[in-house]
Amino acid sequence: MNPAALAKQPRRRWLELRFLASVCAAASALWAFIELAESVVEGETHTLDLAVLMALRTAGNPDDPLGPRGMEQFARDITALGSPGVLTLLVIAASVFLLLARHHRSALLVLAATGSGALATRLLKLSFDRPRPELIPADIYISTASFPSGHAMGSAFVYLTLGALLAQASTNQRLKLYVLGVALTLTGVVGISRIYLGVHWPSDVLAGWAAGAFWAIAWWALAHVVRREAPPGSNALPDRRLG
């Protein structure tokens, strides 16, 4: 074996370990979603769901979220970061950038992962058709079922997909951790805002996070396979820098 091939072996082993870790993470997220779904269908989460929601409401006035008025407005601003409109604009902007940078497969990955994720979210909501909490403010428009939370699931598969792409484009470990941390934080605060506003049961949000994480990780595991099988010099998914 030539020296160049020997030098590549540690990196290949690391990529294989990372692939196995992603498969395990995806399987864990899927398992968590299935367990939550079964508990919701059987009514096992209702008592805890209601207790958490009521703990976040003003005593004697369940229509009013806990805290100052500005807190509710802040939660509405945060929850907008997980809205279909905002997430769609982010996906379009990222995809156009990747296409202009000639990273066509990366653009295809983003579009496929997020587009199929949006479809999966819709199908899951139709399948479970869980009623929303009765605490929803009258001025918040709701048109879909409660389980799983679309904002939580959409934020997970969009922000985690884009975060993983940006992290992969950097060779700086601290930058990688920062980008992934931002993606996780955005996903987390969007989900929490849905509970605080009373538009979702806590189990809806947990299930949305689990399903969205599974979707994002599963697509990146697929991307690993595509990258590994791509011939040398092909326009595969970027390993280091974008642009």
Predicted region positions:
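Membrane-embedded catalytic cores of phosphoryl/pyrophosphoryl-handling enzymes
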Residues: 133-243
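N-terminal transmembrane-helix/juxtamembrane module of multi-pass inner/ER membrane proteins
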Residues: 1-85, 128, 132-139
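Hydrophobic alpha-helical membrane segments, chiefly transmembrane helices and signal peptide h-regions
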Residues: 17-41, 81-99, 108-127, 156-164, ...
